[in-house]
Each structure stands twice: as C-alpha cells, then as structure tokens.
C-alpha cells in the first residue's frame, strides 16, 4: 500500500514550503521515491507568520492536484495549527482546520513555551470526539527530560516525530529526544515535514535509523499503519 505522511508543506506559495509549482512537483517526485502513496498537505496556520486565506490554500491544492500524475501520492488537505490566539478563537467557534474528512487535526506549540492548560484542553478535545496530533514533539523544551508531562500529554494526543530529527539533522538535543520517544514507544507515527526536496533525503536517513534500531516492522507501523489509524480518528497505542 505504501507509506502515509501526515505532515508536509507541498502547496506552493502559501507558507515557507514550496515556492512555486515546479517545487511542488519536485517534492511530489521525491515523496513518491520515498515510497509515500498518501500525502497530507499541511500549510501553516500561524498568526505571527503564516496565515494564508483558506480559499487560497484550496486553490493551490487544486493547482497541485492538476500537476500530480499517477506516480505521485494522493493528496489530503490539512493544516499545521499553531497553538496561538487564533487557535484559541477557533477552539471557541469549532473552526480548527482538520485533516479533510477526519476528526484529527495537526497542532504545534512554541518550542520553549507550553500553552497554559494544554493537557486539560487535549482531554476536552478527546471527549468531544476529536484527535489532536502533535507535530515534532522532540522540539519542545518542556518535554525534554520530563517523562511525566510527556506521558500525560500522550494520553490524549498522537505524537508524530519528524524523520529529519531522527536522522540527526535538526540538532543533537532534538535527535536525542526523537529517538527516545521512538525507543520508549511514545511516538505514534513519523512524518517528513517536507518543505523542500532535501528534507526527503534527511527523512530517508531517519527511516534507515528506525529500520536498523527498531526493525522494519516498526517502520511499517510508524509510517503506514499508525498514520492510517490517526486519519480514522483512532489514537494508536
């Protein structure tokens, strides 16, 4: 069936990902070469930096769909939602952009500032039948060397580790955290977070590390079975 990638910035001209249509196609080529058959496109929703109009996002999705060929992964629209003032307003109005057709949505938080009441809000999301998905948990300083908090958040949230971090490309501290989450069984899935073609080369190194250290069954679980569970609204064990 192939891999399912929950996090990427393939759509051109909406954030810090692909700058133009050719770059989007180059990313699709590289994603296909990595073995990905379903690609979630998750443009930033970040008030301080990237907040593209949703009509523009949808038009860019249509444009990339028109460029996509049979060899490329299918596309599913989502968003990478920064936990900021806009996110709080969207909680109140129930307007958080989800992975299309699912109860799951991707979130990120500031690296050095855990949002107040985050654990309680994650619980509320789950009680409402929603599945929050935390992007790159290895980046968040408050989770470093804090297993109690890490496990508390993990109870109501799917952790999706960046493959580039696993491969050691995002810093030594992030690599240590990413690998610990995998080895301790706290990572639900892995993703590329691809912004450019070079990110896929880093992702391949991360996959090779998982294959060597944890076995190929772990690669399949983290990059195929678990992402499909998440898109079905299920929190993987």
Language model features with spans:
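An N-terminally biased module of ancient metal coordination in phosphate/nucleic-acid-related enzymes
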Residues: 1-71
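Mid-to-C-terminal alpha-helical segments outside catalytic/metal-binding sites
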Residues: 204, 208-237
């Amino acid at each position: 069936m192939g891999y399912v990638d929950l996090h990427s910035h393939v759509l051109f001209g909406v954030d810090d990902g692909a700058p133009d249509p050719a770059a989007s196609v180059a990313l699709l080529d590289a994603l296909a070469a990595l073995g990905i058959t379903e690609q979630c496109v998750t443009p930033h929703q970040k008030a301080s930096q990237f907040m593209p109009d949703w009509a523009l996002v949808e038009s860019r999705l249509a444009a990339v769909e028109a460029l996509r060929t049979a060899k490329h992964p299918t596309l599913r629209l989502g968003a990478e939602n920064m936990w900021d003032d806009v996110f709080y307003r969207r909680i109140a109005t129930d307007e958080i952009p989800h992975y299309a057709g699912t109860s799951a949505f991707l979130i990120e938080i500031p690296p050095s500032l855990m949002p107040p009441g985050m654990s309680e809000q994650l619980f509320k999301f789950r009680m409402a039948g929603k599945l929050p998905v935390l992007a790159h948990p290895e980046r968040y300083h408050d989770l470093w060397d804090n297993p109690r908090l890490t496990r508390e958040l993990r109870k109501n949230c799917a952790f999706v580790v960046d493959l580039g971090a696993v491969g050691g490309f995002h810093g030594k501290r992030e690599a240590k955290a990413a690998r610990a989450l995998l080895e301790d069984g706290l990572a639900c899935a892995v993703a590329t977070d691809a912004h450019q073609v070079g990110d896929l080369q880093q992702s391949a190194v991360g996959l090779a590390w998982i294959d060597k250290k944890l076995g190929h069954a772990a690669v399949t679980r983290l990059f195929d079975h678990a992402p499909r569970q998440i898109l079905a609204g299920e929190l993987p064990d």
